[in-house]
Amino acid sequence: MAELDLIAPGPLTGVTAHPLAPLGPDPVSAIPVEKEDADPLSKSGEETQEQGHDPAELGAPGEEDQILCDFCLGASRVRAVKSCLTCMVNYCEEHLRPHQENSKLHSHQLTEPAKDQDLRTCPAHHSPLVSFCHTHQQCICQECGEGEHRGDSTVSLDAARRNKEVDLRCMQLDLEQKLKLNENAIARLQANHKSVLVSVSEVKVVAEEKFGELLAAVRKAQADVMVFLEEKEQAALNQVNSIKTHLEHRSLEMEKSKQELERLAAISNTVLFLEEYCKLKKTEDTASPSIYIGLKDKLSGIRKVITDSTLNLIQLLESYKEKLQEFSREEEYDIRTQVSAIVQRKYRTSKPEPRTRDEFLQYACDITFDPDTAHRYLRLQEDNRKVTNTTPWEHPYPDLPSRFLHWRQVLSQQSLYLHRYYFEVELSGGGTYVGLTCKGIDRKGEERNSCISGNSFSWSIHWNGKEFTAWHSDTETPLKVSPFRRLGIYVNFPGGILSFYGVEYDAMTLIHKFDCKFSEPVYAAFWLSKKENAIRIVDLGEEPEKPAGSSVEAAP
């Protein structure tokens, strides 16, 4: 099996002044903290020197980024050299002398000059913030440290920043490496696209030669085999394109995360930096997929079948395509694009399946409805986190190939691949379906296989206002469970598990579990079959309501 080359990121260029500076010039993401405008009314160097100060010490009136002494008056305000966190004042060298010479002021904490808005005080005690509490991940004043934070693990602000800068740098380097691996995988997928075409083409040539020997009696069987191969070719290409789309989406997410880390690294104010860092969401560890196409090896089996069967083809003409289908169903001759993921050893351990909501939340994922797939009768609200069936009122969505034309369905914008995932939805009204499907689901067809209950690559449960049923391959399975308004959906992609849970205040009740065979990225899928149906993607920070009677009511 060909494996993806793990490329360690090389030395990062362009980092000279600050260890957390951006990795290179980026006109889009490199947003200046302050905008400097030259003031045409600023005084000349000669006029400045006549006032007895060096031009470098004076703050030009139009230079907003310069921090001036608060004790200096008029136009001769001098640049500050220190800020006192006790006095909450900026001092120039001259006005700083009392702090240096008066022993009563030696206890005041002096820092590098800071803008007025950066001289942060404790909102509870109105005292300067002097320490960082590791226990509660926040900046605190001295009174906080002696009170509610007594006994907590605390360090100075400067020490806390140094520690966080090291962590931030590691995150940047780790993200750089993952981004390179992801881009490498995308490049391999592009190459594999050609490999699929070439490999299938080779089998077509063999089939053409052998069927030529059978003359007119073989023409119908020849056409059947060609259709068979083309279907498998299209299926393989669809898988490649689906995986490529997933990886490209991951690249975009990691680019956004990279820009956010660079923005955070550029913050000069220590307190603001620490506050922003504590809000920072850790980047999810992502397995680095390695792409292997075993198509040619598997097609050799088909080639052997075609060659060997030529001698007995007259007797096999009626069942030729059926015989090929039998080989296709066997793993040995399965004409598919096989994608293997190379996962770091620390992620290969088999973790037990979660049981409590807190355990499920370890795999929380933030999904939204994809407006480019929503049927025109579906209205998206709340930043694409709520969908409502507004039949017969249409919405002026653009006509796109990805939009569902007949079935009132919508997919998630995010694909699920290689990992475990958990999200929750809230149902309103009977006739709602929730599940998973693949990217290749037909968007324009009216047949049952175009909806998420009627094909072999979709799995869903249906709430009809009274009870739940499970659907797969157009087969319905009644479920004997209590009604629930909020559902938890758990996906274990490597394990081939899709589970639906009823979410209550103090319990997680299994509604149904599908054993699936995932071979490409999947998408959360939703079908609102009746008007005024609604589905809302729940913010996982919302605690479930305490149970009170029936949880779900049918729509009027």
UniProtKB/Swiss-Prot annotation:
Signal peptide region: none
Localization terms from the record: Cytoplasm
Domain (B30.2/SPRY): residue spans on this chain: 347-545
PTM per Swiss-Prot/TrEMBL: Phosphorylated by ULK1. Auto-ubiquitinates via its B-Boxes.
EC class of the enzyme, as a word: transferase
Parts forming coiled coils: 163-266, 312-332
Primary location: cytoplasm
Pfam families: ANCHR-like_BBOX (PF22586), PRY (PF13765), SPRY (PF00622), zf-B_box (PF00643)
SUPFAM superfamilies (alphabetical): B-box zinc-binding domain (SSF57845), Concanavalin A-like lectins/glucanases (SSF49899)
Tissues and organs where the protein is expressed, per its UniProt entry: Widely expressed. Expressed in basal keratinocytes.
EC number assigned by the record: 2.3.2.27
Superkingdom of the organism of origin: Eukaryota
Gene Ontology cellular component annotations, sorted alphabetically: cytoplasm
Reactions performed catalytically: S-ubiquitinyl-[E2 ubiquitin-conjugating enzyme]-L-cysteine + [acceptor protein]-L-lysine = [E2 ubiquitin-conjugating enzyme]-L-cysteine + N(6)-ubiquitinyl-[acceptor protein]-L-lysine
Keywords for the protein's UniProt record, in alphabetical order: Coiled coil, Cytoplasm, Metal-binding, Phosphoprotein, Repeat, Transferase, Ubl conjugation, Ubl conjugation pathway, Zinc, Zinc-finger
Zinc finger (B box-type): 64-113, 117-156
Stretches that traverse the bilayer: none
Disordered, as annotated region: 1-60
GO molecular function per UniProt: transferase activity; zinc ion binding
Composition bias, Basic and acidic residues: 33-56
Function: E3 ubiquitin ligase that plays an essential role in the organization of autophagic response and ubiquitination upon lysosomal and phagosomal damages. Plays a role in the stress-induced biogenesis and degradation of protein aggresomes by regulating the p62-KEAP1-NRF2 signaling and particularly by modulating the ubiquitination levels and thus stability of NRF2. Acts as a scaffold protein and facilitates autophagic degradation of protein aggregates by interacting with p62/SQSTM, ATG16L1 and LC3B/MAP1LC3B.
Family membership noted in the UniProt record: Belongs to the TRIM/RBCC family.
Assembly information from the UniProt record: Homodimerizes via its coiled-coil domain. Heterodimerizes with MID1, TRIM24 and PML. Interacts with Galectin-3/LGALS3 in a ULK1-dependent manner; this interaction mediates autophagy of damage endomembranes. Interacts with BECN1. Interacts with ATG16L1. Interacts with p62/SQSTM and LC3B/MAP1LC3B.
Protein's name in the database: Tripartite motif-containing protein 16
Organism expressing this protein natively: Mus musculus
